[in-house]
C-alpha cells in the first residue's frame, strides 16, 4: 500500500471515529436534558397544593415554561410555546390537547391579568402538564 493511500485511509478512519464520538456525546446530552426536565417536573409537583397563592401561581408559570422547553426539545427549535403547541395536536388525544391549551391559557391569565389560582386549579393544571410533558419527552 502506498504512503499517500495509507495516510488518506487513516484520516478517513479518524474522521469517522470523531463523528461517532460526537454522536455518542450528543445522545448522552439528550438523556441528561430529559432527566433534568423530568426532575424539575417532579420538584414542581411539591408546590401545586401550597396554601400560598403566589407559590401556586409561580408553579403554573414554571410548568408552562417547562412545557415550552420540552416542545422546543422535541421540535428542535426555539419557537414560542403557543406556536409549538399548534404543531403538537397530533401527539395527544383531542380532550387532552384541549386541556393542555386550557392550562396554557390559565398561565396567560396569571401572567397578564394577575389572576389567582385555587389549589384545585393548580393541581388539575399540574396533572395535565405532567401527563403532556412526559408524553412529549418519550
Language model region names:
Residues 118-132:
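Short, hydrophobic-biased amphipathic alpha-helical segments
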Amino acid at each position: 500500500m502506498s504512503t499517500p493511500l495509507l495516510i488518506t485511509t487513516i484520516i478517513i478512519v479518524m474522521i469517522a471515529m470523531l463523528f461517532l464520538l460526537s454522536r455518542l456525546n450528543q445522545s448522552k446530552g439528550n438523556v441528561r436534558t430529559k432527566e433534568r426536565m423530568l426532575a424539575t417536573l417532579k420538584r414542581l409537583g411539591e408546590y401545586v397544593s401550597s396554601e400560598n397563592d403566589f407559590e401556586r401561581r409561580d408553579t403554573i408559570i414554571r410548568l408552562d415554561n417547562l412545557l415550552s422547553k420540552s416542545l422546543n426539545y422535541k421540535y428542535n427549535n426555539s419557537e414560542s410555546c403557543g406556536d409549538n403547541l399548534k404543531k403538537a395536536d397530533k401527539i395527544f388525544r383531542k380532550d387532552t390537547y384541549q386541556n393542555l391549551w386550557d392550562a396554557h391559557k390559565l398561565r396567560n391569565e396569571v401572567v397578564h391579568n394577575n389572576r389567582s389560582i385555587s389549589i384545585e386549579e393548580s393541581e388539575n393544571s399540574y396533572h395535565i402538564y405532567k401527563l403532556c410533558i412526559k408524553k412529549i419527552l418519550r
